Amino acid sequence: MQIKIKEGIIKENILFIFLAALLMAAAVLQLTIPLTKFFSFEYSVVNSILITFFISIITIQNLHKKNPESYRDFNTGTASNLFLFFIIPLIIAFINTVLKNQCPFYHGLPYYFTIVFPAIFVGRGIGIFVFCAIRRFRNIGLIFVYLLILTIPLIEFYLNPQVYFYNPIFSFFPGNIYDESIRVDVTLITYRLINLIFFESIAVIYFLSKKIEFRRGIIVIYTLITSLIFIILSPYLGFSTNMERIKRKLPVSEETANIRFHYGNERTKKEMSYSTFEAEYYYHELSEYYKTEPDKKIDAFVFKDSGEKRDIFGAGNADVAKPWMNQIYLSEQTLNRTLKHEMSHVFTSKFGKYVFEVADKINPVLIEGIATASEGFYDDYPLHYLAFQAYKNGYLTELPELFSGLNFFAKASSSSYLTSGSFVKFLVDKYGIEKFKLLYRDIDFMKHYGKDIATLNKEYIEFISIQDFPSNKAVANYYFGRKGLIQKNCPRYFSAKTEEIFELIAKRNYLDAKEIISELELKNTSWALTYAMIECNQGLGEIRSCLRYIENKETTYKGTAYEEILAIRKADMLFLDDQTDKAMNILVNILSTSSVHRVYFLAKTRIILSEKMVIKEYIMGNEETRAHIFKKIFLQTSNISLIPAIQDKINYQDKKNDWILEVVLKGTVKNNYEKYALIKLSELLARQGNYGKAKQILDKAKKPEGECIFNELLKSVELKLLRLSEGKTQLQNE
């Protein structure tokens, strides 16, 4: 008798048992996949998607077979099942955390409760709606409704100026550009509370009436009308962004023949004018490069900082283009570096594919490769120069590997962008842009080039290998010795804790910051943590302790992008410990490696300041103190290597600073790095509207003549200055 009862219970709950087993298997599978293997945001999102769907199925079955009479009966009959659905992924995550000792379990709890707990009620609401709206084939109808809700973000992504989404099934998506910093904030909590209340209200309303037909009609009408009202109010609640919202935030516009810029009130008229001039110049360059141009004006939205951009658009840490909308989204701090790259994405829409007008199979190698190739430079170095350094020092990725799966994202972004850009530039230069356009729409190398990717890869490597550049291990390490996205350990947790650390450092709460750093370093190696620990030790005056810490880290960062930066910080500590000779030896050694430009200037600046006996004041000083020191020493030495350290702190529109330019013009350019410093100063002057002085500085950069890795950059800037100095009217009428 008992066996029969148990068999009956199992038979009655066979669907639940099957779905629970499926949920358990999915949770275990997630632990093998990058990002979802950590108990964090992604893990919660995936389980929210699954639990919502499974509970919808169970709800439909419960209403169909058991037909509960009241809201109380409905809850009583499903409470244990709902609880088990909620707890299964949580238990598996807990066991995994204990066994692998990765992210602290408490880190994932806010994500899980905020995202997954409301999913229970969302699933019930969807199930009731489908039960009421569809009479036959309800499971098929459920799949349709479920997919419809999931596709709403695609509609928003396509039509609205945003890349983030709020959705009742998966709660929140920060954008198609990965951002490690996602917090459970007031907006997300509010959104999930609204989800919970709305979808559970469907259940309450369903049981208010005893008449089945009335129930069905009122549920359908209530759900559709409430959903429509929510969609209309969504931009005002901060859950979506329409054009009205973005223009309220960026009310100032500047327009030319081909570009329309949208700014906040912070930018000056001169700054806006330069950006539009520069954009017009890039527009003409890209038109010549692609042999085509967009059908309508490009709209460029420029946010004051990454925080504002994240709140309004999403993707705070990356600039983005929407080619199908002829729109680009930039931050004030990155505008001058990324403007041409993002504009290039808009140009590729002319030969792009699908509704989003991008590369075939949405291939990132082609999408980012052609935009990078059209610039010709990466961080002011020629693309092939950096690819050559990768080849010579064992970093260059084989193209078949880069085109495969998620390998583009497995590498550090600098490595993937550089390799893609250099390869695509090789293809365009050798075979022409028209063949590449065909490839962009249809990734079939044999069809369009008569060669497969392996053969083209061999051609490309042969081309790179014979480039006439000196090999430089330091440059290769700097750009290619970094971790990729899916190689990082517990990225959400470490990002949140790192932000907390730097907030504590800003408040000079060094002891609490050190305690967190020490805890994190037991599980992860991160340059941000290393840098923060050095700052804490310096702030506490624990110089000897800091030196020991740095020496222990030297092996860790050997051959990486941070090796020389760590050496510079070691030199700083040696200066503070009165070990000047040792510090100078480190800095001189860095100069001898012909490192990247910014590392060279960091080292050279310290050597100059040490010789002038102000190095300690510089290391311990704040930004204002450092700016004063730089001006003073520059006046004494006229050393052009100091220019990069002061140029962002100087307003050259102020006549009081004319003396700096006069000193520069009287000085002597001693090496290629100083040539580079003058090129960047020239660009800055042009940005501030002083084209005359910009040209004088650039003319100065031409001497001495001879081979220089920055000669291509110099020619590019010279041509741009020539065009910009001709004025806005001529640029528009060309």
Residue ranges, per PLM feature:
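Internal/C-terminal transmembrane anchor helices
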Residues: I212-F239
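Central hydrophobic cores of alpha-helical transmembrane segments
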Residues: R138-P153, I218-T226, Y440
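Acidic/His/Gly-enriched intrinsically disordered linker/tail segments
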Residues: Y146-L150, D179, R183, A315-G316, ...
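Beta/coil-rich, acidic/histidine-enriched accessory regions frequently appended to metallopeptidases
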Residues: I152, E156-F165, I169-R183, R192, ...
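Membrane-interfacial interhelical loops
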Residues: T32-Y43, I88-Y112, I143-L193
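Juxtacatalytic substrate-recognition/specificity segment
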Residues: E42, I246-N363, S374, Y378-P382, ...
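Active-site recognition of the HExxH zinc-binding catalytic motif
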Residues: I60, Y71-G77, N81, L286, ...
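Hydrophobic alpha-helical transmembrane segments
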Residues: M1-N62, L721
